[in-house]
Amino acid sequence: MLFYSDNNKDSYDSNHAIIFKDRIKDIQKTLEDITEFYRNKGIKPTIFQSITDNEYFESCKEIFAAHGYDVFEEENRYMVLLDDCRIVPNPLVEVRKAERWEDTFRTDIFEAAGEPWETEVAKAALEKDHTLFFVGYIEGRPVGMTYAHTKDGVCRVDYLLVATEHRKKGVGRAIIQTFAKYCMENEIENCFLWPDGESAERIYDEAGFRLVEVKKAARACYLK
């Protein structure tokens, strides 16, 4: 499975392949095809392991290396919204549910957080009907956001980002508190995520998310 965006070549979210072990016959030919596809587009190839294929990339590490890839493994800690939120939000942070894109989201959140490549991904997500998008404001200025995808009775939280200068002010907690409250009030069930680090996991735990499973995630990055 190949994802790509000619307009956002620096984003891993927009440009990556996923390999499913049971759908390929020749891993070497598959790697050659993936590498050629992305290099012809001027994109550095990144390949993700299917979450169902535990340890598959590790078992093929020498094959990946022979084709110019390095394999990295990390834990994905899956959390599900099961309990009531315990967060008391900072009253100076106002959180709103966004219905349309604003250019200040790009400058004041993504660029201010040092992640401009995620702008087009978030913008495209907001344009879809099944996306929940919440923005945190301080003194009327957007300083953080999160968004989630809802489909077929499942809600996956994709991203939580706060502008660098506004971190450690309770912005992330306020945003997640509003999001969790919205899900509970609107009976949005099966809401899950995997946190990016211990700090994020603590915030999600306070919001009522509980750790339910830990899986090994793997990706292969092209080094040439």
Question: Whereabouts are the PLM-identified features?
Answer:
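Conserved active-site alpha-helix within GNAT-family acetyltransferase domains
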Residues: N54-V71, R173, G197-V214
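Conserved GNAT acetyl-CoA-binding A-motif
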Residues: K41-I51, C183-D196
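A structural microfeature
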Residues: E73, P142-G144, E213
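A conserved beta-strand-loop-helix scaffold within acyl/acetyltransferase catalytic domains
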Residues: N8, E115-T164
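Acyl-donor-binding surface of acyltransferase catalytic domains
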Residues: I27-V93, E99, A217-C221
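N-terminal charged segments
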Residues: M1-K41, Y56, K61, P116-W117
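Conserved acetyl-CoA-binding loop-helix of GNAT-fold acetyltransferases
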Residues: I27-T35, Y159-V162, K168-K181, E185, ...
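Short amphipathic alpha-helix that is part of the acyltransferase structural core
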Residues: I19-D22, F72-Y78, L82-E120, A124, ...
